[in-house]
A protein has these predicted regions:
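C-terminal nucleotide
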Residues: 1-119, 130-175
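Glycine-rich active-site/cofactor-binding loop and its immediate structural neighborhood
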Residues: 126
Length: 175
């Protein structure tokens, strides 16, 4: 099941919860309807990384830099800057071979219809895009008319967490 939970345990990942600092999230997720295996995207990139491929290493260094700048833009509510950073992130991922035709179609539609930024979400090569928009309902209408299967609006949630057992509710012992 989900690799995102694994990120919290990865020694090389930096995961920060920002939901308490950002009053609203002007994003929408648009699903292309394309099913795929993330392994088909990640495996070749991982192999290239391990072989020391300069293009892949430079690409991921750039993605890391863009993420740090994006965090600052997000926390500052600078949506135009965040949109430009999302577009730059997508260009790097696309150039590394991570995007697919369905992703590109929805991203193009989003950007042509008022989105400040749009990029693939997840592994790429189909699946889902995320768009930064100040007019989500209008963009949803355009994306659905353009072949999008489903639109979702992300919102901060607590997510999965571990809780201490209730000391009052001790497990029963076998008879």
């Amino acid at each position: 099941a989900g690799g995102k939970g694994w990120l919290f345990e990865d020694a090389f990942a930096t995961v920060e919860q920002l939901d308490g600092y950002v009053p609203r999230l002007p994003f929408l997720l648009a699903h292309t309807g394309v099913e795929h295996s993330s392994d088909a995207v990640h495996r070749p990139l991982r192999e290239r990384w391990l072989e020391g491929d300069r293009e892949v290493r430079r690409g991921y260094e750039e993605i890391s830099r863009l993420a740090r700048e994006g965090k600052r833009a997000l926390l500052g509510g600078d949506w135009e800057r965040l949109g430009r950073l999302m577009n730059a992130n997508h260009a790097v991922q696309r150039d590394l071979g991570g995007s697919g035709e369905a992703n590109e179609h929805l991203i193009r539609l989003a950007l042509e219809n008022g989105a400040l930024g749009a990029k693939l979400a997840g592994a790429g090569d189909g699946g889902t895009i995320i768009a930064l928009t100040l007019e989500p309902e209008a963009l949803e209408e355009v994306l659905m008319a353009g072949g999008c299967e489903r639109v979702l609006y992300p919102s901060p949630v607590e997510g999965v967490c571990l809780e201490d057992e209730d000391p009052e509710a001790a497990p029963s012992s076998p008879a």
